[in-house]
Amino acid sequence: MPSMTRKTRIQPIEHAAEDDDNGYDRPSKSQLKREMHELQVLGQALVDLPKDALKRMPMPESLADAVREARRITDHEGKRRQLQYVGRVMRSLTDDETAALRTALDAQRGVNKAATARLHWIERTREQLLANDDALTEFLRQHPEADIQEGRTLIRNARKEAQQGKPPRYFRELFQWIKTAGGTSNADDEAADDAGDDHDDDEA
């Protein structure tokens, strides 16, 4: 009898525990994979941000360093590996830190969307003013605070410099005149300025 007692084993219980662990293991790995992918997407969004916008992101220094390094790398494979590293660094963030980053990115995207729409409106208005004299009357009706004499002078000079093939000085000043008369927020103002300068440089 004592020998039979010694042979009593508990492996079946251990196996059952292992089976339970395995039962939860697969969804846990899938969830981890999804979370890692989401963090890499978030990291890619950080890497793609304009430099000034990146400075406003609430990041710990370790993540900021990893993102800056990814921006610096031009080799495709090297950048891919660095982006994976950015994702791993982001796994060390707390939920609150990750949420703060997402909120800041969403806010930045909203600013960019509004600024882009604003830029397109200014450009369309400039085209209309240069193409049709009646467009100035309509613009002044909607924006009575605008300086009509300055607007007329800029339109006349922009048309003349285009005909003569000169650098688009007044063309750019007309952009600023429309933007000022139309009114805009500081964030949109800076973004429209940057985008407007880029477009004008292309046109030049």
Curated annotation (Swiss-Prot):
GO terms, biological process: assembly of large subunit precursor of preribosome
Protein localization: Cytoplasm
Listed Pfam families: DarP
InterPro entries cross-referenced by the UniProt entry: DarP, DarP_sf
Biased composition range(s): Acidic residues: 187-204
Molecular function GO labels: ribosome binding; rRNA binding
Key words, A-Z: Cytoplasm, Ribosome biogenesis, RNA-binding, rRNA-binding
Main location: cytoplasm
Family assignment from sequence similarity: Belongs to the DarP family.
Protein name: Dual-action ribosomal maturation protein DarP
Organism of provenance: Burkholderia lata (strain ATCC 17760 / DSM 23089 / LMG 22485 / NCIMB 9086 / R18194 / 383)
Gene: darP
